Amino acid sequence: TAARRKNAAAFEPRLRDSRLELVQAGAGTRPGWLRMPARLKSGNVQALGGDSRARSLGIYPSYPELLDQLPGMAERTMERTDGFPGAKELTQHLLTLPTHSAVKAADLQAIIVWAGGTP
């Protein structure tokens, strides 16, 4: 967990002016950062499937589609009248960055460069 927190902390100041907006931890919390969630400011994260550089760096979209669009789930979804705009936003813009202990300084640097952050 210490390595994950250290790696997550390295992203914060260096991605401020990038194409990503990091999801902030709640006040008074100390997350373990299994992965660092970030919002793509423009574009669609599903396009990352074709971005071999992003995939090689461990950058992945979080949610491929809305739950009510998954096979067998539509009939189990109750409130479908509003189209789930918040969930749709997540499927289009939320991605995660790796924070595990095998992420080295060069990996962090490459992720920051990929995101257009400050090296």
Each model region followed by its residue ranges:
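PLP-dependent aminotransferase class I/II
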Residues: 1-119
